[in-house]
Regions:
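NAD(P)H dinucleotide-binding glycine-rich loop of Rossmann-like/cofactor-binding domains
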Residues: 85-142, 146
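Glycine-rich cofactor phosphate-binding loops and adjacent beta1-alpha1 units
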Residues: 165-167, 176, 180-243, 250
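Glycine-rich beta-strand-centered segment in the early N-terminal region that forms part
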Residues: 21-38, 48-91
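Mid-domain Rossmann-like dinucleotide-binding core that forms the NAD(H)/NADP(H) cofactor-binding site
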Residues: 119-189
Length: 301
């Protein structure tokens, strides 16, 4: 099969289109014919060596496609089903991908492959942080930093879905997008607005940016009995800090896909390009430069 291979770890110029050996499905796995993959920040971290990786690997952490074979223990999927999954380090930049059944979710008929794959990683992190990490309840006031990113966008929607009053930070295009799509959300420009100007008013703050400055401001803006969650920080000397690690789950992905189908959630896609080494390099450069307006998608077939 064809795949995009990273010949030298840490060198994205060494990405090449290559022929690799076909995959064999094991008992608990599903073999998927790739239709779309998302370009995720974690792929860059794995590729540059900061999160593992190796020479000659295939990058990619999310996939949407068609089931072409199932292992003998698989019960929830059959050949021909449409599927989406987050498979960290799952080598998804390829014509076919192996997905453990526990990570897989069915794509509803009215959801495109691109829309489905756009939410399986960042969307899952955003949703789980609000629902399981911060355990947001109706009537609470929630602040989401980085609201226009894939994590922040779903965090906003999950908080609204829970019945919370929501504020968010963004800049540039993100400000306009959030105000257009979520008029009920108070949107701040993180470059110019002081989120703590009104004191400690938030019951829960989700920091999807991860900088020390943002985290410090978050605590200033959070009530004494409130909670703060960050996608980066793993420990903090403040009783309000929530320790939470998102575990990939097909069940959570199914919730998100069903939400897309019903209109309960939306996805925002920046671009769709054919999967190739050149386009992976292009999208990586765009992510690193900033200013991406939604999820970057690569398609197959």
């Amino acid at each position: 099969m064809k795949a995009v291979v990273l010949n030298r770890l840490g060198d994205f110029d060494s990405l090449v289109d290559a022929e690799v050996r076909d995959l064999k499905v094991s008992a608990d796995e599903i073999l998927v014919k790739t239709r779309a993959v998302a370009v995720d920040p974690i792929d860059i971290k794995i590729g540059n060596g900061s999160r593992g990786g190796r020479d000659g690997m295939i990058l990619g952490s999310s996939v949407a496609g068609d089931v072409v074979a199932v292992g003998r223990n698989v019960r929830g999927f059959k050949v021909g089903d449409r599927l989406a999954a987050n498979v960290r380090g799952g080598e998804t930049y390829a014509e076919e991908v192996l997905v453990p059944e526990r990570l897989a979710a069915h794509i509803p008929d009215n959801v495109t492959y691109a829309a489905a794959v756009s939410v399986v990683l960042g969307g899952q992190t955003g949703y789980s942080g609000i629902v399981r990490g911060l355990q947001v309840k109706a009537g609470q006031h929630v602040l989401v930093h980085g609201g226009s990113g894939s994590v922040g966008l779903m965090a906003i929607q999950a908080a609204l879905d829970a019945g919370a009053e929501v504020s968010a930070t963004a800049s540039g295009w993100g400000l306009e997008m959030l105000r257009e799509k979520f008029p009920q959300v108070t949107v701040f420009d993180y470059k110019t607005d002081d989120i703590a100007a009104n004191g400690a008013v938030y019951d829960a703050v989700y920091d999807t940016v991860g900088s020390d400055r943002v985290l410090a401001a978050s605590f200033k803006a959070t009530k004494s009995n409130g909670h703060v969650l960050s996608i980066v920080a793993r420990s903090y000397r403040d009783s309000r800090f929530v320790h939470f690690f998102n575990q990939a789950s097909g069940e959570t992905v199914q919730t998100l896909l069903d939400g897309l189908s019903s209109g309960r959630f939306i996805s925002v896609i920046d671009s769709e390009l054919p999967l190739s080494a050149d386009n992976v390099r292009l999208d990586y450069a765009r992510l690193q430069q900033g200013g991406v307006h939604g999820k970057l998608i690569l398609t197959v077939g």
